[in-house]
Structures are given as C-alpha cells and as structure tokens.
Amino acid sequence: MAVKIKLTRLGKIRNPQYRIAVADARTRRDGRSIEVIGRYHPKEEPSLIEINSERAQYWLSVGAQPTEPVLKLLKITGDWQKFKGLPGAEGRLKVKPPKPSKLELFNAALAAAEGGPTTEATKPKKKSPAKKAKGGEGDADAAAEKVEASAEGEQTESAES
C-alpha cells in the first residue's frame, strides 16, 4: 500500500487550517487518514507549524512519501534533514513571542500610575436594604433635630431684636 503524508484542509473559506496526516495515496484530500501527525495554520503570523517529529521520522522510515507542501514544512521544521542525515536538522522555524500575562500588564500599569487607582473598588458599595431602613430612621431623627435647632435659632434671633 502506497502511503503519503499530506495536508487535509479544515477551516473557513478564507481561513485555511490544515492537518498533516498520513493516509493511503488513493484517498481523497479530506478523506480517511491513518494518523494525524501535525497541524499547519498559514494565516497566523508567523505561521503555526506543529509536527510530531518522532511520528514523522517513523512514517518516513517505513516509506511514506510526503507531498510537495508537506516536504517544504518538513524542511522548515528540520525533520527532513534529520531523516536524510543532512546538516541543518535544527530547522528554521520562526517562533511566536510569548504573550505577557494580563496580571503582569495590570501590575505594570499600576506601577506606571504611581498613586493612581489601587486594586480597591472605585465606586463605594451600596448599602443593603436592611441598613437603609435603619439608616432611614436615623436620617429622619437627624432631620428633625436640624429643624428643631433652626427653629430655636429663629426664636433667639427674634428675642434679641
């Protein structure tokens, strides 16, 4: 049985994503595969190429023939050079720089603000309804005291005149 290492297409219309699969040479492009050994996303920057090197070496050693696009990917990852015994087995794969964590970005922004907002809430918490009921009676008492004080103040002013 002739075995090929080929790409099977996934993804949307303008966003192709491929699996690197080992399949019988007679099967259609997206047909049944024997084993999936990697994935390739060409639209990402830099392109995502993940190949299980151990499985690729095995399939190449038992006679699986890579298609032209897969051969290029194997050369980029260095698996083809390793299989053939050529120099450059480390490959020339570009690696995406790791994203900084959101916590680190937040802490850096706080440090840059120097005395700006802290990690505490910026809005005061709302009082619960039970506290409002108790506070409402207290507010009514305080308002009554203010009215009495202003009434006494008016009486003293009229008495002085």
Curated annotation (Swiss-Prot):
Compositional bias annotation for Basic residues: 124-133
Residues of the signal peptide: none
GO cellular component, one term: small ribosomal subunit
GO molecular function: structural constituent of ribosome
One matching Pfam family: Ribosomal_S16
PROSITE patterns: RIBOSOMAL_S16 (PS00732)
GO annotation, biological process: translation
Residue ranges, annotated region (Disordered): 114-161
InterPro entries, per database record: Ribosomal_bS16, Ribosomal_bS16_CS, Ribosomal_bS16_dom_sf
Keywords attached to this entry: Ribonucleoprotein, Ribosomal protein
PANTHER family, per the entry: 30S RIBOSOMAL PROTEIN S16 (PTHR12919), SMALL RIBOSOMAL SUBUNIT PROTEIN BS16M (PTHR12919:SF20)
HAMAP family from the UniProt entry: Ribosomal_bS16
Family statement: Belongs to the bacterial ribosomal protein bS16 family.
Protein name as annotated: Small ribosomal subunit protein bS16
Upper lineage: Bacteria, Bacillati, Actinomycetota, Actinomycetes, Mycobacteriales
Gene label: rpsP
